[in-house]
Amino acid sequence: MPMRKRHFYRLLPLASLLLAACTIPVSKGPATSPTSPQWRQHEQQLQQLGQFETRGAFAYLSDKQKVYARFFWQQTSPERYRLLLTNPLGSTELELVVQPGVTQLTDNQGKHYVSDDPQEMIQKLTGMSIPLESLRQWILGLPGDTPNFTLDDKYRLKKLTYQQNGVTWVVDYQEYNTQVTPPLPSRLELNQDGQRIKLKMDSWTIK
């Protein structure tokens, strides 16, 4: 009987060590810090991309509608860009041309609309809520105006949360294209109160 007690007591320190090992917090490391020099360098490279083009697949999903299209985004300057949505047959569903102070939208009937607010115009004409002003930054992998973001282990944007006027958008970066320099997103998803926007970038052209 005494022998069993001594054996039991000898096991207690070992068990305590095992429990302690299971509860030791794992450090996330410097990659998740927005103040890391690697992120700052990557961010500066992205901010210098004044002209670029990307094309791929677009999906807008909500309780009221589901829209699937091909998209083409052409940025010619920080304040000038063109967004084209086409159907599987290649016909234009929507073309948006944004310049400082004026936005022109052309629908699938060839009708033209002019406004100074591209996001509001698209929502009124199509029912889709697309945060275009922020999307210009997010599509490159930049957080834009939000300080609420995390990085992956390669010092790239992983997830962000953006709040404005009572509306919260959550953006998840699911994949990056490492064949271009700097690496740019190839798949991302935006979520806002039951609405989802999925973007898959098949190619990037940097000018």
UniProtKB/Swiss-Prot annotation:
The keyword Magnesium does not apply. It holds the Pfam family LolB. It is a lipid-anchor. It is found in: Cell outer membrane. Monomer. Residues 1-21 form the signal peptide. One of its GO terms (cellular component) is cell outer membrane. Keywords: Cell outer membrane, Chaperone, Lipoprotein, Membrane, Palmitate, Protein transport, Signal, Transport. This is Outer-membrane lipoprotein LolB. Belongs to the LolB family. A lipid is attached at residue 22 (N-palmitoyl cysteine). Plays a critical role in the incorporation of lipoproteins in the outer membrane after they are released by the LolA protein. A lipid is attached at residue 22 (S-diacylglycerol cysteine). One of its GO terms (biological process) is lipoprotein localization to outer membrane. It comes from Yersinia pseudotuberculosis serotype O:3 (strain YPIII).
